[in-house]
Each structure stands twice: as structure tokens, then as C-alpha cells.
């Protein structure tokens, strides 16, 4: 596949995004060879709200069999080389390599070769959010190479989406109870991420669907009562602020928002 025949759904992307995707495709095919089944885009690229300023490039690679240590080493070298590529998105990749059997349905405790934004390839345990990732790929994933993802991933029910979201929401409640966690003092962009994530949680629980962050924000602005509507609105000015540290009032407000979402979801305050 070349830049000229990328799916039309991503043909509008900036050249530096498609350039990274082209290098990603070539490198994966070279490293994996005949074990490759398919390569799919997920996340904001799949859901149609990719933001060149803040979004990362989420991908999923499907393989016939579990990656061998030799193939893992080859992929690690490739990803290290790609990370040094003179392109702003070369460090904005998040993806995983999952074999056909494991991909069909999420099973807790499994580990797969995974790369996170700004990091290298590692063997990582996939948590319950990979129910949501599978759903996104199955229902909206963009196929770069390979069969329709619906042929590879079993249907995921609304009840399974609810269960996965509630598990993640409990994790967020635990986090909101930890005022001494240093990550609460990260720049305002982090607080925007928390607010956006809570909006997505509420959207899924209310609508039985998964949407992008921008879509969830618009929905929340039309749906949430005060003071939370105003918080959601203000948070959008924080999205690209990677410098300003939040004051304690903002941190407290965002924490209360997490607890409000949890209460609406039927989770008792912890």
C-alpha cells in the first residue's frame, strides 16, 4: 500500500500523518512477514475526530500466531528507528500486536507486544479497556491491510461495554480519591483529558455506544447540568496547555466531577 491508495476515510489527513503511517506499514510487513493478518487504525482516526494538535496514531496489528522473541526483537528495533524519524507523529504511536485467537474476545491477564505514546515496544498486560478497543476496531476500524475486522472479532454486546466502562470508572474514582498523586499536578491538558474521559464514560452508559472525545464534549454540553456543563466548556481551553499547572480549586473541581459521574452511574462514593 502506498500513500496514493490509502483508504479515502484518511486521505484528508496531514501529509506528516500519512508519511508515518506509510513507514509503519512498510516496517511491520518487513518485520512480521507471512505471520501478518491485518493492520487497522483505531481511536480518533477510526471514530473520525482526529485532532492534529493532540491526537495520537492508534493502530492494531493482527497476526496469525504469537510473536516470537526474535520477531519481537525485530519489531523493537523497527519501532526505535521509527521513533527517531524527523516527523512530529513518530513518537505519537500507540498500538498492539495481537494474535487471531486472542483477538476474538478479550481475556483478562493476557500480555501482548504493545507500544505507548513516547515509549518503546514492550510486553504489556491488556486491561479491560481492550474490550472497548476491540469494539472500536470491529465497528469503526479502518482497514489498511487485511480482512474486515468483523470477521476477526466476535460481537461485543452493550452489556459488555457497560461492564468494561464501569470497571474503568471505578479506577478513575480511586484516582480521584488520591489528592497526593503527583499526576494531579500535571499541566491543565491532563485535567482536560480527565474531563473528556468522563464525558465519554457518560455517553457510553447513556447511549450504549462509543464516541470520540469531541463528540462526547458536544453531547455533554447539551446534556449535563450546571456546574458540570461549565466545567466541560472551560476544559476545552486547557486541551493544548502543556505548561500551566492547575491550582487546587481546579483539581478539586475535576475530582468532584469524577465522583458526580460515578454517582450517575450508580457507583457509591468511595
Label each residue range with its predicted role.
Residues 1-40, 71-72, 270:
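Helical scaffold of the NTase/Pol beta-like nucleotidyltransferase catalytic core
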Residues 3-11, 61, 240-244:
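Glycine- and acidic
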Residues 2-10, 77-188, 192-195, 201:
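Conserved NTP/Mg2+-binding pocket subregion across the NTase superfamily
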Residues 199-207:
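Extended, well-ordered alpha-helical segments in internal regulatory regions
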Residues 41-77, 92-97:
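Catalytic metal-binding acidic patch
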Residues 209-270:
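Structured mid-to-C-terminal alpha-helical surface segments
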Residues 17, 164-168, 194, 250-253, ...:
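Amphipathic alpha-helix face/heptad-repeat signature
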